[in-house]
């Protein structure tokens, strides 16, 4: 009985309906409209499914209509296949409005689903995108405002567009179509990992996140708690983002160990007495 109930709960948890006011029907808007068609399939958190996407954008100051049959001559910004999943940890668990991650692909996953780089709503060409779901933020502009405040000072900041989202004919509300951080001409300027004369070369991208992935690196240091003391019950874990763990098999031997050593060297410096040293201190590891 317990296993049966657990399975039913898991299935229900992945069929998230629109949030409050589910009876609201989108008719027209000055924002682009993103139509996602999953053909009734269940959207999951860990595995991607094949879906279709169609983006209507008649231009700045123009009205976009949700009834495609009644308005067949609207401008289609992009139409094609995507691999779709839910995304986020806190943003997923603490919100009734679920964020999505998707990659643009040339054909369905069942037929190979090779990724294809495209420009969506004027954003730089790439294949990795997210739909942020402003739920607690009733202004729906805090994420975008933060991006814009950081843009003059950082080498790269995600660009984004507010959009209306419709999934399988149901209106899900206003989302923020956003570039996902990653390696690419229009994203982060990272060099491919490789080898030169026995030395490992290239760039790696990791992030501090929860230890809910199958493979991660746990720091040998514990974090500080709210009262300024070390909390030995908690851990700092690094997730492999680029390259991902699955890519290590195709990279030079020792790549994972090299990433871990780089993390150790950085943290040892931060925890050492000479962390302020102008040459070998934190400036060696952080772009300040």
Predicted regions and their residues:
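Phosphate/dinucleotide-binding and metal-coordinating scaffold of catalytic cores
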Residues: 10-288
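Hydrophobic h-region of N-terminal signal peptides that target proteins for export
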Residues: 2-10
């Amino acid at each position: 009985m317990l296993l049966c109930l657990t399975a039913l709960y898991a299935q229900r948890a992945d069929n998230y309906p629109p949030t409050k006011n589910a009876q609201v029907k989108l008719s027209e808007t000055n924002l682009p409209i993103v139509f996602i068609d999953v053909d009734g399939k269940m959207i999951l958190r860990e595995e991607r499914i094949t879906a279709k996407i169609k983006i209507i954008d008649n231009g700045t100051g123009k009205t976009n209509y949700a009834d495609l049959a009644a308005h067949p001559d609207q401008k289609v910004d992009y139409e094609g296949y995507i691999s779709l999943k839910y995304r986020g940890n806190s943003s997923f668990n603490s919100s009734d409005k679920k964020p999505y991650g998707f990659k643009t692909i040339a054909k369905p996953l069942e037929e190979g689903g090779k990724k294809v780089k495209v420009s969506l709503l004027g954003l730089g060409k790439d294949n990795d995108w997210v739909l942020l779901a402003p739920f607690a933020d009733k202004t729906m502009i805090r994420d975008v405002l933060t991006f814009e405040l950081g843009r003059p000072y950082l080498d790269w900041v995600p660009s984004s567009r507010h959009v209306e989202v419709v999934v399988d004919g149901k209106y899900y509300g206003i989302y923020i179509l956003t570039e996902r951080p990653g390696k690419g001409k229009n994203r982060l300027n990272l060099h491919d990992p490789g080898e030169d004369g026995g030395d490992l070369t290239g760039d790696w991208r990791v992030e501090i996140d929860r230890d809910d992935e199958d493979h991660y690196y746990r720091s040998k240091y514990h974090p500080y708690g709210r009262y300024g003391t070390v909390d030995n019950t908690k851990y700092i874990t690094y997730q492999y983002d680029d390259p991902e763990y699955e890519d290590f098999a195709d990279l030079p031997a020792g790549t994972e160990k090299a990433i871990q050593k780089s993390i150790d060297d950085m943290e040892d410096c931060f925890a050492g007495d000479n962390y302020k040293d102008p040459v070998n201190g934190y400036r060696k590891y952080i772009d300040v």
